[in-house]
Amino acid sequence: MPEGPEIRRAADNLEAAIKGKPLTDVWFAFAQLKPYESQLTGQLVTRIETRGKALLTHFSNGLTLYSHNQLYGVWRVIDTGEIPQTTRILRVRLQTADKTILLYSASDIEMLTAEQLTTHPFLQRVGPDVLDARLTPEEVKARLLSPRFRNRQFSGLLLDQAFLAGLGNYLRVEILWQVGLTGQHKAKDLNEAQLNALSHALLDIPRLSYTTRGQSDENKHHGALFRFKVFHRDGEACERCGGIIEKTTLSSRPFYWCPHCQK
């Protein structure tokens, strides 16, 4: 599943295609969304926001389209009038005079008012987004040490969207390698230097993935274009200490680590 940086880059592409342009045609596959087709035609997309792995498409009439790609959903940008060759099932089409954005295969799609945005179950549950520039390492540190999270092993905590939105498996692996920790640690057991390093890495690594294009090679995954240090590199030498990277399973997900320098 794509993680926060890939979702944000997808949102950037969608915004670049249609933001601020009048919608000339709107189509939804689901019956409960059909009444909104006429309401949105002629409106503008004002911005496309990410909350972790969810996308919020805001319209000039105050409505917001909530969508979560889950495992199979994917957005595409095409020239208006183009007919894509695909076997995917179309769910949403937002068309302007020159560009059209299409959502395929997703099933978690809703139209929300401004009030409903504040009470939506997923949006209420999800934690601060790691790509939100307003989120600071100090706030992350406080969250790590909060009663809710301080006793959780990092192997599961760094996959929990209620802790920080936008994290996922490759980010979990890379963050823990960066700070030299294994997934079995808990925030309550770290010293001050370790807490500070982890608090910064929890923001720095996702933001690096989002902002850089890095080396595009076999070490990329789901569009993550910065170079992996350990993810998918089992059997290779660790570039920090020369030890051999190993692969195991933590919290039911593949986990890559260097047993020589991650303690």
UniProtKB/Swiss-Prot annotation:
DNA binds at residues 70, 125, 169. Its EC number is 3.2.2.-, 4.2.99.18. Binds 1 zinc ion per subunit. Its cofactor is Zn(2+). It catalyses: 2'-deoxyribonucleotide-(2'-deoxyribose 5'-phosphate)-2'-deoxyribonucleotide-DNA = a 3'-end 2'-deoxyribonucleotide-(2,3-dehydro-2,3-deoxyribose 5'-phosphate)-DNA + a 5'-end 5'-phospho-2'-deoxyribonucleoside-DNA + H(+). Gene3D superfamilies: 1.10.8.50, MutM-like, N-terminal. Keywords: DNA damage, DNA repair, DNA-binding, Glycosidase, Hydrolase, Lyase, Metal-binding, Multifunctional enzyme, Zinc, Zinc-finger. SMART domains: Fapy_DNA_glyco, H2TH. This is Endonuclease 8. It comes from Salmonella enteritidis PT4 (strain P125109).
